[in-house]
Amino acid sequence: VLSLSLGVRIGLKSKELLKLGQAALLHDIGMINIPHEILKKETLLTEDEWEMIKTHPLNGVKITMDLMGLSEESAQILLAILEHQKSYDGSGYPEYIKNSKISLFARIIQIADFYDAVTTPKFHNLVPMSPAEAIAYLVKHSGKLFDPLLSKHFINLLGIYPLGTLVFLTSGEWALVIGQPQDPDKLHKPVVLIIKDANGVDIPQKLVDLSQSEIDIVRADSPWKYGIDPAEYLI
């Protein structure tokens, strides 16, 4: 979804969006060859385990070629699967790829995959970043790890406080960001769902558009640190 949203944001046509969507769905298919105990390991990987993880892009290409064959239509998808762990500056893996410029689809998927991985409790990610922390990391490493233009579009797409961010308000209440303001000059004032009082006790939920309120955000944090699953409130 994030990859497609970014593709729409930069103006890709429907045919390209279809291929981008396929690439995004299949980019980690090579993980099926990685032992389950490694994928679900909750401690740091050993060097050998990490080397096994790094085989998944090439494994993914092989699996996808068996499914789709090699053609002009599948070439972009296969290249994205192969390159999605490469960074904008050429670092990352597979190490043998020395292209100075990573393919567009791979650069899009890399950003979306990074954001999803660090903000969601998954294997090897014991303390997820808050959405705001992930955005700050994107900003800091834009032009190095991440395509700077795509990063800018992605950040504008999500807003300063992306959906699911836990925010602490000047009222003392806790809230989750559930929407972005219509006014682009008020990205610091999103729509929030107040869920707890100043003591962290559940209260009747209240929807507040901060762009229309005198209440401000004091700070943002990861909801997972406080045992809050945003999906319970956003779905």
Language-model features, listed with the residues they occupy:
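Histidine- and acidic-residue-rich, metal-dependent catalytic cores
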Residues: V1-I235
